[in-house]
């Protein structure tokens, strides 16, 4: 996969990233970047923080150079609608305008859903904290290197408010 250029959108504000770094040794975007580089060492990866206007302006001026965009998970709640959250949603809208291929994970999916005109509602019973059971990898997924030597049916932690 030579010449693959991916943009990762960090889903956390600085304060939340610092907590994540303290716990894991890297930000959410850096963890994802490290995983992608392990799977495909030749991929070019850039990280953008939607709350940093200078970064956003620079990235949008070169958005057509990216093969795809990955929106990470994060600790914010989209329905809080802070200025920072609005910047994330606006950035997703800009990516849509350029017809970029997008992978949105957790928080990123909520941001992209709102940017596309959807609705994200708070959980009716509060936070969901538990285990997603019997997650099954489909035939295409079974061929992906990420699932090499892994079970194709598994349980995983699940946590979200919205």
What are these regions (language model features)?
Residues 1-90, 94, 98:
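N-terminal beta1-alpha1 cap of cysteine-dependent amidohydrolase-like domains
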Residues 39-41, 114, 150:
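Short, structurally constrained coil/turn elements
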Residues 44-46, 119, 155:
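Conserved beta-strand segments of alpha/beta enzyme cores
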Residues 48-51, 123, 159:
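Conserved beta-strand termini and adjacent loop/short-helix elements that scaffold enzyme active sites
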Residues 54-57, 119-121, 141-145:
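A short, acidic/glycine-rich surface segment
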Residues 75-140:
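Cysteine-nucleophile active-site neighborhood
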Residues 125-162:
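An acidic, glycine-rich "communication" segment
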